[in-house]
Amino acid sequence: MQDLLLAKVESAMQASQVSALAGQTATVTKVSAATNLATITPTAAGQAPIIVKLDATRQVVELQALVGKTVMVGKTPAAIGGIGNWIALTPVTGAKAAAAATGAGQLVMMKVEGTAAAVNLPALAGKSFTIAQPPVAAGTKAAGMLYLNPVGGGDLIAINVQNAATQTGGLVGKTFVVAPSPVIGGTTGKFLVLKPLTAGAGKAVGGGAIAAKFIPAAVTGTGGAAAVGAGSASSLLTAGAGTVTPITAAGTGSAMLSAKGLGLGLGLGLGAWGPFLLGAAGLAGAAALYVWARRRHGTPDLSDDALLAAAGEE
């Protein structure tokens, strides 16, 4: 993101005069440290220079660095909570001018409350967020918090700002990039600056954000749902998994198996499943399984007496 310069000026009239050039280029022709006056001259012929009075010495120094350079004039930031009058200038060179004009949009500015919030503002600069609906319980009023939902996924960020409860409702659902906070009369910026993100970019990234929030929930934790991880569904759908056989109806029972049960299970041609099935089904179940196993291998059925005799010999 190009270096966006926000300057606080003396009056609303000065801010509106500069804002009338929004989307156009201009040159910072003069900045006086003695009077705090700055002269901005439109690039287009026939337009008169605009003189504004800067609010702080720090901003005088910042604009002095732009003297003789071309800037893209932005719309006057929508300052929430009566935090003064501002102008927005973005340095541009050659081909960057067209890109800056295309992405021009009205900035939104609000003052944060509390030192902790101000200290954390630099970490948000350059990142994209969607303004979220305040999580307010029924019958209560929203606190002075602005909720930022990171584009691409992440924890919801709550920032205490002035007049949030009454003047930020129109921002909900919109996506912005956080711009660097201007510093006035101190060492830390106290202003949250939101730059509109293009609709196409916001939708493209936002679609991925939904997946990022829900996918981790399916693979975290130690509960039963988490135990069914990736691959479990395919293992349940392997060939033959849905076939109903007498083994399925063997029931549940003890897993403690004797040597006799092991021998009978293997003798029935059930392989390693024999001990578990016999332990669950008991002697009567073994007889039924014996009949099923003989039919499976094409062996003629035995009489009831022969069947009981075979089971008794084990």
Curated annotation (Swiss-Prot):
Keyword Nucleotide-binding annotated: no
Disrupted gene: resulting phenotype?
Answer: Magnetite crystals are elongated and their surface structure is altered. Another deletion missing both mamD and a 25 kb region of the magnetsome island locus (called SID25) gives dumbbell-shaped magnetite crystals. Deletion of the probable mamGFDC operon leads to a slight reduction in magnetic response and slightly narrower magnetite crystals.
Residue ranges, Cytoplasmic side: 1-263
Location relative to the cell = Magnetosome membrane
Report residue spans for region: GL repeat: 261-270
Ranges in the topological domain labelled Lumenal: 285-314
What does the record say about PTM? Seen in gels as a band of about 7 kDa, suggesting it may undergo cleavage. Upon overexpression a larger (full-length) protein is seen in the cell inner membrane.
Q: Which UniProt keywords apply?
A: Biomineralization, Iron, Magnetosome, Membrane, Metal-binding, Transmembrane, Transmembrane helix
GO cellular component terms given for this protein: magnetosome membrane
Q: How does it sit in the membrane?
A: Single-pass membrane protein
**What is the protein's major site of localization?**
membrane
Q: Where is this region: Magnetite-interacting component (MIC), binds Fe(2+)?
A: 298-314
Q: Reported effect of changing residue 305 to A? A: Isolated MIC makes smaller magnetite crystals
Q: Where are the transmembrane segments?
A: 264-284
Q: Which InterPro entries match?
A: Magnetosome_regulatory (IPR053512)
Q: Please describe what this protein does.
A: Helps regulate magnetite crystal morphology, probably in a single growth axis. May help control oxido-reduction reactions surrounding the crystal lattice of the forming magnetite mineral. Probably binds Fe(2+), may play a role in nucleation of magnetite crystal formation. Expression in a deletion mutant restores growth of spherical (wild-type) magnetite crystals. Increased protein levels allow crystal growth in the minor axis but not increased numbers of crystals.
Instruction: State any further remark.
Output: This bacteria makes up to 20 cubo-octahedral magnetosomes of about 45 nm in diameter which contain membrane-bound crystals of magnetite (Fe(3)O(4)).
Domain comment in the entry: The isolated charged lumenal magnetite-interacting component (MIC, residues 298-314) binds Fe(2+) and Ni(2+); Ni(2+)-binding may not be physiological. Although it binds iron the protein fragment has no effect on magnetite crystal formation in an iron co-precipitation experiment, however mutating some of its residues decreases crystal size.
What is the name of the protein in this document?
A: Magnetosome protein MamD
